[in-house]
Regions:
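Thiol/selenol-based redox catalytic cores and closely related redox-interacting motifs
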Residues: 1-103
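Short, solvent-exposed mixed-charge patches
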Residues: 108-110
Length: 110
């Protein structure tokens, strides 16, 4: 692990950002955004089979689709901000642009 990566892990993988050190996963997106753990309640997937989850992903009104696809869209928008909206075929999508606009209003202190 490089020194810069080690510094990121040391900062974000410890209180007050997590209950205790070792609370992975966390994602750092280009130093712009850090997401700690999942952005939805894992209980929404509890007791579902892989087939049920797959079927639910096909229904945009399902809790599973809203959780998983919504989270993916947030990660995509954050990545687009970090890459200067590249690739435009993805980053130019209306949904992603709308989420980007919201993300850009978030004030973060480090």
């Amino acid at each position: 692990m490089t020194a810069s990566i080690s510094a990121i892990v040391s900062k974000w993988d410890s209180p007050p950002y997590t209950a205790q050190a070792g609370q992975f996963p966390f994602i750092d997106i280009g130093g712009y955004f850090t997401l700690l753990n999942t952005s939805y309640d894992p209980a929404d997937l509890a007791n579902l089979t892989w087939n049920q989850i797959g079927n639910d992903l096909s229904d945009p009104t399902s809790t599973v689709a809203k959780d998983v696809i919504g989270n993916a869209n947030i990660l995509t928008a954050a990545t687009c901000i970090a890459t200067g909206d590249t690739p435009s075929s993805v980053c130019g999508m209306a949904t992603i642009q709308s989420i980007e606009a919201g993300l850009k209003t978030i004030k973060v202190t480090t």
